[in-house]
């Protein structure tokens, strides 16, 4: 009987590990897909823009941030648009735009440094803890660089929350625990 209980417990732990990995991979893939489509949308807007001054540039960046936030997936927490380098900033006087300034510190300097070295438009991923609750909510910051001939380069970041996936995993853990208890009662 003890062997059966230990086997059931080990199978439950292994199943939880596999399920957790699968759920987190799906959440990551969904975030990357959403962010990729958002980047394509922003790049099209930049390519179509014909700006003549700093005020127009600032207005476009603000509009892009609002559009990205409203068209993003349901787990999109915030959008952050920043200039790529200080030289461009001095020329245009661009003020960074954020739809959720409370979490702008989650865009790390190490991620920005990796992106500064990029010239191929890759999408960067950084897991984070969003300080909403004690212990934080799992999430991720995704970032990429887009550019336009008349405006230079723009760093685009998006913060995604994995709170719903975390809740689903907690419910699965509770259900598996209940099954183990029921199994031990039936066997014992």
Language-model features: locations:
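Residue-identity detector for threonine
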Residues: 7, 28, 52-54, 99, ...
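Extracytoplasmic ligand-binding sensor domains of the Cache superfamily
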Residues: 54-129
